[in-house]
């Protein structure tokens, strides 16, 4: 959790700062509100990317493509759209902070294109094998499919991301045992 030492706690500013450092890699407000150093604040964004990339650790994604995917996911995170609403103080002293999120539709928007390009690649492999060329290894084929997926996502990001219907989420902030908000 994040630590806050201010006497006059502003839950709306706190949530805004946490979202900005988590998704936009904007650290200034977060540093001011939490007392974190610039390095600590930047680490929040990097840790979120680490968590995203951990999901691929057990996947057959080629190691050489991981830095490209990491950078792309960072760019995608920076495009997340949210609005922090008016805070409501709960009876137990905690705060309920409504956040309206517009989800990115990149992955669903690009799925059909990816499927089509993956099928085209499979057809190319079949054609070349039928013409007497060696069958690519599973690793080579998986590597090519991950490259295709990266290219499709990259194209989607470059052509402008689209958003789905806004959803409302409520974040709850309370003091922990040390008297810090998280």
Segments the model singles out, each with a brief description of its role:
Residues 4-78, 83:
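Core segments of small alpha/beta cavity-forming domains
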Residues 25-29, 104-106, 179-181:
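Primarily extracytoplasmic ectodomains and periplasmic/lumenal surface modules that are beta-strand-rich
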């Amino acid at each position: 959790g994040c630590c806050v030492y201010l006497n006059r706690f502003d839950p709306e500013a706190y949530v805004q700062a946490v979202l900005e450092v988590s998704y936009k890699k904007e650290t200034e407000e977060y540093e001011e509100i939490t007392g974190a150093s610039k390095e600590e604040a930047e680490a929040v964004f990097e840790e979120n990317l680490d968590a995203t990339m951990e999901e691929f650790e057990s996947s057959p994604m080629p190691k050489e493509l991981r830095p490209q995917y990491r950078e792309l996911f960072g760019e995608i995170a920076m495009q997340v759209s949210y609005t922090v609403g008016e805070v409501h103080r709960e009876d137990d002293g905690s705060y309920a902070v409504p956040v309206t999120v517009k989800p990115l539709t990149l992955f669903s928007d690009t799925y059909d294109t990816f499927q089509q390009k993956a099928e085209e690649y499979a057809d190319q492999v079949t054609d070349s094998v039928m013409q007497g060329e060696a069958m690519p290894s599973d690793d080579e084929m998986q590597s090519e499919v991950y490259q295709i997926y990266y290219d499709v996502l990259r194209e989607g990001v470059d052509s402008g991301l689209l958003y789905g219907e806004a959803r409302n989420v409520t974040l709850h902030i309370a003091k922990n045992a040390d008297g810090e908000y998280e």
